[in-house]
Amino acid sequence: MELLGQKVKEDGVVIDERILKVDGFLNHQIDAKLMDEVGRTFYEQFKDKGITKILTIEASGIAPAIMAALHFDVPCLFAKKAKPSTLTDGYYETSIHSFTKNKTSTVIVSKEFLSEEDTVLIIDDFLANGDASLGLYDIAQQANAKTAGIGIVVEKSFQNGHQRLEEAGLTVSSLCKVASLEGNKVTLVGEE
């Protein structure tokens, strides 16, 4: 997605050789038109897979996931990082390590909203080591739901997340692939 790549290069802030900040359009302030294009692109890539639900994790995955859900005309379900007092029935849970925050969280999804009848598309904002996507895949497996694929907005291709997801047998679609953050500069795959 050329528009997304341009936005990452122009508005992304390199924190260090492993961390890219995209708060201006994805992780804090959201560019709704760009997220609409992200959702439309995921729809075009997975429209023939029988998607019944979009699955993501709070908070930064919600914007691209909700836009994808609009294009698929299906519900968007997000894993919660804390169990609310209103969740009185059963739930699926797994542990996910955040590369950016260097923190492990237990995330949950109510059994009421995910079942073996679902075919999910997992959407996430970033792919680094793949822990968030693998955690969501684990939740889908606990529900005996089918996972049609993983949609990633920004992939850091210099890390091993893509490989880990493919080794798990998952189809991965990354809309923007960052090859390097060296020299305080964003270099996309194909530009190196």
From Swiss-Prot:
Binding site for 5-phospho-alpha-D-ribose 1-diphosphate: 128-132
Pathway: Purine metabolism; XMP biosynthesis via salvage pathway; XMP from xanthine: step 1/1
Reactions mediated catalytically: XMP + diphosphate = xanthine + 5-phospho-alpha-D-ribose 1-diphosphate
One of the GO biological process terms: xanthine metabolic process
Keywords: Cytoplasm, Glycosyltransferase, Purine salvage, Transferase
GO MF annotations, alphabetized: xanthine phosphoribosyltransferase activity
Binding site for xanthine: 20, 27, 156
GO cellular component, one term: cytoplasm
The keyword Transferase appears for this protein: yes
EC number: 2.4.2.22
Cited Gene3D superfamilies: 3.40.50.2020
Top-rank taxon, per record: Bacteria
HAMAP family in the cross-refs: XPRTase (MF_01184)
Subunit structure: Homodimer.
Function: Converts the preformed base xanthine, a product of nucleic acid breakdown, to xanthosine 5'-monophosphate (XMP), so it can be reused for RNA or DNA synthesis.
Family as reported in the entry's similarity comment: Belongs to the purine/pyrimidine phosphoribosyltransferase family. Xpt subfamily.
Protein name, per record: Xanthine phosphoribosyltransferase
Organism: Staphylococcus aureus (strain MRSA252)
Gene: xpt
